[in-house]
């Protein structure tokens, strides 16, 4: 009887041990499965403000003092990055350019200037220059897409533009210009053919003020 009781005790202990092991394995598997189906957190997208279009509240949120904000608003439009940086002298431009910028003309900007774009080094600045002249932003995306992924190409679009020929550029090319919406694109097309930039200023000047007209003129040319 004593041997039988001992055998029962051993059997019960072994059974409890096996059940415990099984539960531990199942728990580990469930934890692993849960970890596997979790999607990695995507980094928050960074908004890059156009220095010519950022609102007063945008500029304040970027950390500019009231004095600098007033100077920036009064000096716009900035027709080059040097015009912009002259006002923010003393600021941490390396960090600021990740958040605010004056888009660069892909066909006329010096190669060395492209390197002030965050994340653009010697090699990429060379590639930007290598494929000139650009006739459309689509061409830029296609050529630079040989070297970086689609997401990185899209990021570059906050920092550059391709000027458009007023009489021949497509509607999509015009809409790709910084700060050009559907309505203004329509007006650009409406007054074709343009004989000269004076005509462009006269017609488009019906819809925007002098400052905005100066900003828009930077994006266009006539053959």
Enumerate the predicted regions with their spans.
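Short amphipathic alpha-helical boundary/capping segments
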Residues: 58-63, 114-118, 174-178
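Accessory alpha-helical DNA-binding modules that contact the DNA backbone or grooves
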Residues: 71-108, 124-167, 184-221
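Post-signal peptide N-terminal segment of mature Sec-exported envelope proteins
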Residues: 29-52
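Bacterial signal peptide processing site
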Residues: 22-24
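Bacterial N-terminal signal peptides that target proteins for export
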Residues: 1-8
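C-terminal motif of bacterial Sec signal peptides marking the signal peptidase cleavage site
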Residues: 17-20
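Disulfide-bonded cysteine-rich modules in secreted/extracellular proteins
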Residues: 49-54, 104-115, 164-174
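Small-residue hinge/turn detector
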Residues: 65-66, 121, 181
């Amino acid at each position: 009887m004593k041997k039988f009781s001992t055998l029962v005790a051993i059997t019960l202990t072994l059974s409890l041990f096996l059940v415990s092991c099984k539960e531990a394995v199942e728990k580990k598997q469930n934890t692993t499965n849960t970890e596997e189906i979790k999607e990695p957190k995507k980094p928050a997208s960074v908004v890059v403000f156009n220095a010519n279009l950022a609102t007063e509240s945008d500029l304040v949120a970027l950390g500019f003092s009231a004095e600098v904000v007033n100077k920036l608003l009064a000096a716009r439009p900035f027709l080059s990055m040097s015009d912009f940086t002259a006002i923010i002298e003393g600021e941490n431009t390396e960090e600021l350019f990740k958040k605010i910028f004056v888009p660069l003309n892909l066909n006329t900007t010096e190669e060395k200037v492209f390197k002030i774009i965050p994340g653009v080094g010697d090699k990429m600045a060379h590639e930007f220059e290598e494929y000139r002249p650009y006739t459309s932003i689509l061409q830029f995306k296609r050529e630079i897409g040989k070297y970086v992924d689609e997401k990185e190409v899209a990021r570059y679009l906050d920092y550059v533009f391709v000027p458009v020929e007023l009489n021949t550029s497509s509607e999509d090319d015009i809409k790709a210009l910084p700060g050009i919406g559907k309505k203004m694109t329509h007006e650009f097309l409406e007054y074709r053919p343009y004989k000269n930039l004076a005509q462009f200023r006269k017609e488009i000047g019906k819809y925007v003020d002098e400052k905005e007209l100066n900003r828009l003129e930077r994006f266009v040319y006539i053959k």
